[in-house]
Amino acid sequence: MGKYVLKKIASLALTLLAVSFVVFLLFSVIPGDPAVSKLGTQATPEKVEALREELGLNGPFIVRYFKWVGGLFRGNLGQSYAYSMPVSKLIGSKLLINATLSILAILIVAGVSIPIGVYTAKHTGGFMDKVFTVINQIFMAFPPFLLGLILTFFFGMVLKLFSPGAYVGYEKNFLGFLGYMICPAIALALPKTAMCIKLLRTNILEEAKKDYAKTSYSKGNNTTGLLYKYVLKNAIMPTITFVGMIFADMIASGIVIEQTFGIPGLGRSLLSAISVRDYPVVEAIVMLIAFGIVFVSALTDIIHAAVDPRVR
């Protein structure tokens, strides 16, 4: 198991290195000059050139790349062109916001989909199975931003459980912050939860049809014991993998959710940085997102290998 974990860590590092090269290359060749964006189009060529030199934009590509990557390894994400402050300080507080949103959403997906998926598989064809099937179809058809608007209207304006747009910062009131983040997390999680319920139910029913399950049942093992001891262990593996895969989609959807609920997270900072060509901020956020996706993917594989040694 140790060798497998080390192999995954090495793979993670190589993937991030490749992503860093592509990201840096992309923002080096796209049209637009950060110096002009900061000084304005009326600035003289001399001032533009002086600022480019100050920002280190005139050096060879490969030198600038290795300098940037070296900074990443030291935790130095660079200096913001627009705000003239360290990128780590600019986006550090927003990272906790997005991490909280993603973790809450993943917990909702896992906490709801597993028990309901098991229940509907165990009572397949029953009344509640049909009810959950209809509900799943409805939620899978709803985009997260639309769910966000509906939840904002219902919980914020009808039930008045929170004030829409009145975001509470974690540094002021952490419990208030968590309370405000629950609704966005639900909006982000519900479509994925519906998918996970359907996937887990299907996998359990498929596993129950296999010879080992039929043999165990014929020997007198009751349905519940067979389900939890053998079938669920094998059926849940694809669901764990799927949860890891949807993490990337959650990050993309989270940017929209931020706008819907007025959350000052990484998504808003990313859009703002792109509009003013603040490339160090954009590159840092993209790398953080890439790290999150690759890390969760590697963690999912490690959990899969721990549960099922055949994967190693």
Regions inferred by a protein language model and the residue ranges of each:
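Hydrophobic alpha-helical transmembrane segments of membrane transport/permease proteins
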Residues: 16-66, 159-180
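Low-complexity, intrinsically disordered, cysteine-poor segments enriched in small/polar
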Residues: 61-64, 68, 72, 90, ...
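Membrane-water interface segments at the C-terminal ends of transmembrane alpha-helices
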Residues: 23-29, 59, 67-70, 134-164, ...
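Alpha-helical transmembrane segments of integral membrane proteins
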Residues: 2-3, 95-128, 144, 173-312
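Membrane-interfacial helix-loop-helix junctions in multi-pass membrane proteins
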Residues: 53-62, 74-87, 168-181, 188, ...
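N-terminal signal-anchor/signal peptide hydrophobic helix marking the start
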Residues: 6-16
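Membrane-embedded alpha-helical segments of multi-pass transporters/permeases
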Residues: 16, 20, 24-29, 145, ...
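An internal, D/E-rich "acidic patch" concept
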Residues: 58-114
